[in-house]
Amino acid sequence: MTDTKNATAPAHSESETPQKVAVITGATGGMGREIIADLAGDYHVYALGRSAAELPESDSITPVVIDLVAGLDEGMKLPELDRVDVLVHAAARATKYSVEEATPENWRAHMDLNVHAPAELTRALLPQLRKAEGTVVFINSGAGRHSYGDNVIYAATKHALYALADGLRISEPGIRVSTVAPGPTDTPMLKGLQDYDPSQVIAPAEVARAIRTVVEAGPTTQLTEIQVRPRIELHLRK
């Protein structure tokens, strides 16, 4: 069930410059929260997530309670938006499985949230993105270019997300499309996968800065891919 908390696009008179609008998924996650906090100063942000109690809210942030996977069957129930200048796909799930361990249900659960939902949400917002000549940012991962024996499903979804971004960029030349691929980042997702020293991984705020760079690219350019890596790779640390 979606509860947009009576969300509507910010009002403005015809003589005013329209308020820029950003839509961010994964709003209750560590990375999503930082992205929202960074963009909220310049955009009206629609923060999408499943937990009403955890969603941020302010004059410049409208919380939108939505289950993106349920929306694949029920339709994406979204606020009525006139334009979307920035769409950031930050929602994802990651559980380690080998090929032997992974069941069809495991594959479907990861593909639905990590690939199918971004594709469908983008499709639903294409008219608004076209109108604003907006930017779509897909949060990928180092796993999008590599694969590991114990993390095959997550890596497969992130490889697919690259293909989605690259195809969208070709089919929608009026929309800028970027992949931002962070390495290990200090988020609840990473905490669920491994033990680590937070000082040795990427701070979520640094990923938000990379996204800021993408959305502020000049009008004649688009940054198609940014790899965000730890200052010193984990395997090189002494």
Feature annotation, model-predicted:
Residues S98-V99, N106-R108:
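Substrate-binding pocket helix/loop in short-chain dehydrogenase/reductase
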Residues D59-L72:
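Rossmann-fold cofactor-recognition segment
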Residues T122, T157:
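Active-site helix of classical SDR
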Residues I175, T179, Y196-R237:
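C-terminal helical subdomain
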Residues A90-K96:
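Conserved NAD(P)H cofactor-binding loop of Rossmann-fold oxidoreductase domains
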Residues T28, G32-I36:
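N-terminal Rossmann NAD(P)H-binding glycine-rich loop of SDR-like oxidoreductase domains
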Residues S141:
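Residue(s) in the substrate-gating loop at a strand-loop-helix junction
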